[in-house]
Amino acid sequence: MDHRHKVGGYVKLAKLWERSKDAAVAYHSSYYAEKFRDDADKRLVSVYIDITGNKEIYKRPEMVHLLKDCKNGSVNLIFSQTRAYLAANTCDFCFLLQYLFDMPMRVDVVTDDDDQRIDTILDVDNQRQSLKELAEKYTSIRRKDYLEWRIRLEHEMTKVEEK
């Protein structure tokens, strides 16, 4: 049985990158391929790149695709260069975490930034549990908003083609 992490690399770029889309896709695809090339514990499944002005997670086609792949078990590790790529604000970040923590199978999150590094695999200082508690507390306060967000996200997932 393969116990390696199945990695989905995620990048969210501003709309202005549309002009240089091919170069951006090539660069980020190469970055992730190189990052996981010799990692025996992690296998890169796909790189998901959104070039959009949309801040909301459910309006980003590749993020929706990535979350659908997490839900169906194709990906169990979301890797992003920065936390900011994952979510534009605290609300979306907490909703995203809650959605991931609610999945029946474990999905980890790792970011590569020094300032706000997330690594739920290494779990330094019990980071995974702390993030889970943060997400649960936030979504309990904004339960109705979270449920509406989740419904929108899952509706968008039904439109996603398999990669």
Give the predicted meaning of each segment.
Residues 144, 152-163:
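Amphipathic alpha-helical coiled-coil segments
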